[in-house]
Amino acid sequence: MSSNHQHFRQPAIKGGESRVLSRRAILTADSLTLFYEDKKVIDNVSFSVKFGEIVTILGPNGGGKTSLVRVLVGINKAYKGTVRYFGKLGIGYLPQNIKINRLMPMTVEYFLLHTYLGRRAASDLEDSMKYVDVERLLKRQVAELSAGETQLVLLARCLMMKPDLIILDEPVSCMDIEAKHNFYKLVARLVTECGVSVLMTSHDLHCVMSCSDRVICVNHSIRCEGTPEEITENAKFLSVFPNNV
């Protein structure tokens, strides 16, 4: 199988340019197909994410969402199709499962400053904390954090890289309802105040409705796409996700 990741440089969004550039794509995926052994897990998927947009890939467990994300971020290279990125190309990626050695004594502050590869770690962390409330967690041990607190720390780490695009794979899967809503409010704020674009996956329709600009329903292939209001009225959506409406 062949794969093709392409990067294109484009000016960052500034001031009056935002309305124009926001119509342009920061990410395009064209005809992505992926097999695991003889099983086709992604079937001819094409879509785009625009500057300043929140796009959610919505689908059932086992429907190929994580496999698709792993293609987009370059982890899985054994696919057919093309992935193109535009912009300055700062990309933050928050996987569904991340391995942190919870047996090693390590504060949140140490984790953020010493697992980050930028040259201005302390300054970048300070900038990140303007948006993500992790200052109260800095002296806590990583092993003591709840699932929601861990995701906030990892999101803060993503922001330290000054990304143009943040890709979140099932970021709220271990959170309670209140924590989920707070996390999605934070994501919406990051788009508004930082000018980032967000692509995230979810299997929970009700939580993503409040902040997504566009939803792409995927069950190995794209079944429907549109605004949250449009997809809930789509017959294909109702047939694939009857329990989510």
Curated annotation (Swiss-Prot):
It is an enzyme of class 7 (translocase). Gene3D superfamilies: P-loop containing nucleotide triphosphate hydrolases. The keyword Nucleotide-binding applies. ATP binds at G59, P60, N61, G62, G63, G64, K65, T66. GO terms for cellular component: plasma membrane. Keywords: ATP-binding, Cell inner membrane, Cell membrane, Ion transport, Membrane, Nucleotide-binding, Translocase, Transport, Zinc, Zinc transport. It is found in: Cell inner membrane. SMART domains: AAA. Residues 27-244 form the ABC transporter domain. GO terms for molecular function: ABC-type zinc transporter activity; ATP binding; ATP hydrolysis activity. InterPro entries: AAA+_ATPase, ABC_transporter-like_ATP-bd, Metal_Ion_Import_ABC, P-loop_NTPase. SUPFAM superfamilies: P-loop containing nucleoside triphosphate hydrolases (SSF52540). It is a peripheral membrane protein. Its EC number is 7.2.2.20. It comes from the Bacteria. Pfam families: ABC_tran (PF00005). It catalyses: Zn(2+)(out) + ATP(in) + H2O(in) = Zn(2+)(in) + ADP(in) + phosphate(in) + H(+)(in). The keyword Membrane applies. Its main location: membrane. Belongs to the ABC transporter superfamily. Zinc importer (TC 3.A.1.15.5) family. The complex is composed of two ATP-binding proteins (ZnuC), two transmembrane proteins (ZnuB) and a solute-binding protein (ZnuA). Part of the ABC transporter complex ZnuABC involved in zinc import. Responsible for energy coupling to the transport system. This is Zinc import ATP-binding protein ZnuC. It comes from Anaplasma marginale (strain St. Maries).
